[in-house]
Amino acid sequence: MSRADDDAVGVPPTCGGRSDEEERRIVPGPNPQDGAKDGAKATAVPREPDEAALAAMSNQELLALGGKLDGVRIAYKEPRWPVEGTKAEKRAERSVAVWLLLGGVFGLALLLIFLFWPWEFKAADGESDFIYSLTTPLYGLTFGLSILSIAIGAVLYQKRFIPEEISIQERHDGASREIDRKTVVANLTDAFEGSTIRRRKLIGLSFGVGMGAFGLGTLVAFAGGLIKNPWKPVVPTAEGKKAVLWTSGWTPRYQGETIYLARATGTEDGPPFIKMRPEDIDAGGMETVFPWRESDGDGTTVESHHKLQEIAMGIRNPVMLIRIKPSDLGRVVKRKGQESFNFGEFFAFTKVCSHLGCPSSLYEQQSYRILCPCHQSQFDALHFAKPIFGPAARALAQLPITIDTDGYLVANGDFVEPVGPAFWERTTT
């Protein structure tokens, strides 16, 4: 090949005095120590081959041409293992494979834990409660260890097998052309061949197992919540089993069941909940109450402790019991069809915001406004908890209440609409 042909494909002439090994490792480029004339010739754009010549070029010729077109000078390039098949190389290969396989093991563990580990809430009773409490930490632990193991394997592979290379590129502007795309592909192909991944079957298999198990576990964990049937009837009620979204702790389990409005004491010395009387709350005041039944007990037995914990943990259970001042009763506007839901001055509204289910737990006594601190929705307790500000579009669900023969406040039935934010199947507005 002539000197002109060398310039056409960007292959520099052989430098005298260097061995074949040096010639393979060092590809000369523009040398700043040369004279201005030599530097100008070195940085000049090489003559581009036509389409026929471009199609006939080998990958190495395209690689050299791509570097010259991009102003890239390879200052140093050396394979990690000049001699193939040594014991040290095989040890390095096995260490990478171990990390990739560990990623697969942890990914498979994530999948199995997500599918078979007890995930439903269990009241505190020692071993079963401890197993349930590990669910979320195990999700995070197996997911994190899987991706960490794969990342360590990838880093080790780069450090131990990808050829060590130092390249210097001049900064330049310009849009990509067909010749640039072809030479980039040549560079990528050279990088793939130089990585020696093609002949490392153990690492390739380990990487496939690791990424496959990790991807499958992650996909199942992500899609698991999307394929759950929310309408499966699992909650026993007086009207038969219903789906969770249609029920709350205030839903009677049988006809005529008495459900008390109970205050949480927050102490361990006495019972966790005590029944409320009208005189227990001042005019204009608000109290958070929970559904309590006589069968729930006082927490002195294991069964009672379980039931009371379920009351406290139930997301639809908290209710705001508000006592309107006698002077403000004339300003009260009741919702159509719910005129009998209050007991005199006492009104009970769910504490679950109708926007996104946040706890609307702030109450302004002077204006009777209920505030959700998460997204700033405000509800007017004098106007059947109708939203007056913020993103909430529906009134808070109202619980019908009355008083029993012993003077305790009790629920006079269940909520007549689902508690909390909207979903497609609800018909109430």
Curated annotation (Swiss-Prot):
Function: Iron-sulfur subunit of the cytochrome bc1 complex, an essential component of the respiratory electron transport chain required for ATP synthesis. The bc1 complex catalyzes the oxidation of menaquinol and the reduction of cytochrome c in the respiratory chain. The bc1 complex operates through a Q-cycle mechanism that couples electron transfer to generation of the proton gradient that drives ATP synthesis.
Cofactor: [2Fe-2S] cluster
Cofactor binding note: Binds 1 [2Fe-2S] cluster per subunit.
Record protein name field: Cytochrome bc1 complex Rieske iron-sulfur subunit
UniProt GO MF annotations: 2 iron, 2 sulfur cluster binding; metal ion binding; monooxygenase activity; oxidoreductase activity, acting on paired donors, with incorporation or reduction of molecular oxygen
Positions of region (Disordered): 1-45
SUPFAM superfamilies: ISP domain (SSF50022)
Bilayer topology annotation: Multi-pass membrane protein
Pfam families named in the record: QcrA_N (PF19297), Rieske (PF00355)
Domain Rieske: 316-410
InterPro entries per UniProt: QcrA_N, Rieske_2Fe-2S, Rieske_2Fe-2S_sf, Rieske_Fe-S_prot
Lineage of the organism: Bacteria, Bacillati, Actinomycetota, Actinomycetes, Mycobacteriales
Keyword annotations from UniProtKB, A to Z: 2Fe-2S, Cell membrane, Disulfide bond, Electron transport, Iron, Iron-sulfur, Membrane, Metal-binding, Oxidoreductase, Respiratory chain, Transmembrane, Transmembrane helix, Transport
Main location: membrane
GO cellular component, one term: plasma membrane
Organism of origin: Mycobacterium bovis (strain ATCC BAA-935 / AF2122/97)
Family: Belongs to the Rieske iron-sulfur protein family.
Cystine connections: 358-374
Membrane-spanning parts: 96-116, 137-157, 207-227
Compartments where located: Cell membrane
PANTHER family: CYTOCHROME B-C1 COMPLEX SUBUNIT RIESKE, MITOCHONDRIAL (PTHR10134)
Subunit text: The cytochrome bc1 complex is composed of a cytochrome b (QcrB), the Rieske iron-sulfur protein (QcrA) and a diheme cytochrome c (QcrC) subunit.
CDD domains: Rieske
Binding site for [2Fe-2S] cluster: 353, 355, 372, 375
